[in-house]
Amino acid sequence: MFRKKKKKRPEISAPQNFQHRVHTSFDPKEGKFVGLPPQWQNILDTLRRPKPVVDPSRITRVQLQPMKTVVRGSTMPMDGYISGLLNDIQKLSVISSNTLRGRSPTSRRRAQSLGLLGDEHWATDPDMYLQSPQSERTDPHGLYLSCNGGTPAGHKQMPWPEPQSPRVLPNGLAAKAQSLGPAEFQGASQRCLQLGACLQSSPPGASPPTGTNRRGMKAAKHGSEEARPQSCLVGSATGRPGGEGSPSPKTRESSLKRRLFRSMFLSTAATAPPSSSKPGPPPQSKPNSSFRPPQKDNPPSLVAKAQSLPSDQPVGTFSPLTTSDTSSPQKSLRTAPATGQLPGRSSPAGSPRTWHAQISTSNLYLPQDPTVAKGALAGEDTGVVTHEQFKAALRMVVDQGDPRLLLDSYVKIGEGSTGIVCLAREKHSGRQVAVKMMDLRKQQRRELLFNEVVIMRDYQHFNVVEMYKSYLVGEELWVLMEFLQGGALTDIVSQVRLNEEQIATVCEAVLQALAYLHAQGVIHRDIKSDSILLTLDGRVKLSDFGFCAQISKDVPKRKSLVGTPYWMAPEVISRSLYATEVDIWSLGIMVIEMVDGEPPYFSDSPVQAMKRLRDSPPPKLKNSHKVSPVLRDFLERMLVRDPQERATAQELLDHPFLLQTGLPECLVPLIQLYRKQTSTC
């Protein structure tokens, strides 16, 4: 009577109006699934492709720019801080946009970044895999060093003394330094004589030591222009390998001048008004339309002379403030060993350019007592741009608003090295757009996110993917681009073979885009079939600008290890100075990809392939007997080891092979064939 009544089971009806639209099966011959939904198929395809790499330990350094002083800290409020930092951000170029990191990352962060490179081999020093007898180079002291940082040839291995940790100048000194001319320096020299004790004191904002960092010790021992300093270690004069004798009177005089100049920095910072730390607008660099700037000798400057001085810091060996991916004329010791100026550009002694070069290369780090430095270990990242500061800088570049209010029907269609790509629909127009979503916290180098916005916004071309808008959504950067339904060229070359008319059509479109970008001083640095997208009517467009760089007359070369291993040019792998010629080499590898179905050495590991590309003769076609002599000549003009002998994009547009170029419609059958092969069974 009092028993609990059982609940009546709900009745669940069968599916209504059910339609079997997707049928997935496994093809044992091909060893893959067929009939997968498009978003699943795209994810599987992209996971199999090699990812681009950025070696954080090999980042090109640049000279000091005014805005970087503010990045290292300011006494102004946050709003004024960001406004002063980016008052001219709308005209920001990639040269300056890549410089928002305050200083070199710590060893822990470098190790984490290396673990993100997409291959287990990159967890260790890449140099140990790329060592070869030809890879020896000299340090500023004339010692030959191998790529893996071994013992200098011709010298006994000597114990490396405990290095002294650096300290960073107070805020506003760089801006103050730029306003100082030769006359002011001479007038302040007497005042600086009374401040010698400042060289031994430690300011509150001391930079953290990394004396226990083995990788940092290795970088300090290297002294190579290609390697970004692994730490900010500064050794004493007696700690250099080779044990030089006592300095000459002229050397001591130059060293004293440099120390007096540093002392003046400390004294002027204590009395400088707050307004002196606010930088002016960042210098605007005009794009460089010349591929190879002329080289000529210049009279040696003070910076070049300082290379051989036994001072407390080897000038030009360490980057004072930035880890940006731009090359500095002061670091180009091979092309201009006796000058501290840009090759082919002379500046009179004492000119603002010369003084700026001296300041940026030698006068920003001071030695510090190791016992004091150990106490600053807790505040290790005080000089690094915070996440909120970086977001504020990025917010000044992107469009305002929330794209989630404008878009709907998100479908993930791909995944890359920097983020995911979704297909979405605009609510007001119904147009389909591709949305690239990149998490700011998961980037190998977050500064490169500016490239996604700045390059595609400023350089529009018929053969370049159009960017509609960019937004900052929470912790992600969203870039809205046109959606090309034909897919990537990779999908086609991996399934079918292209005839020479189709190869010429693709090459002509890519060369048109590269000729335009190179004339503007833009290096793509990741040319491959994955970066070439197609429309349904056969038009070819270049995409993926996340790893590009910009050169100019002031920054004519780059030297960072950036790109996808199998498509990298030899000069990129060997960390030599390079310019737009690296894109031509990568295009040549892509031509091999269109003929053979895959790039050379694709069965090797990425590191092994890079070693072969660096040390071996240019790769050849597997099916060279199937191509015409004019195509072979076209390919040989691109795959030349010497960048100076390699053809430019404009020269290749005049090559006879491109006379076979057809209309975009000639690529439509390839797109349709691929879509048919991947359609539902």
Curated annotation (Swiss-Prot):
Stored Pfam families: PBD, Pkinase
GO cellular component: a single term: postsynaptic density
Active site, renumbered: 526 (proton acceptor)
Entry's EC annotation: 2.7.11.1
Signal peptide positions on this chain: none
Residues covered by region (Linker): 26-406
GO MF terms, alphabetically ordered: ATP binding; protein serine kinase activity; protein serine/threonine kinase activity
Protein name (database record): Serine/threonine-protein kinase PAK 6
Species annotation: Pongo abelii (Sumatran orangutan)
Source lineage: Eukaryota, Metazoa, Chordata, Craniata, Vertebrata
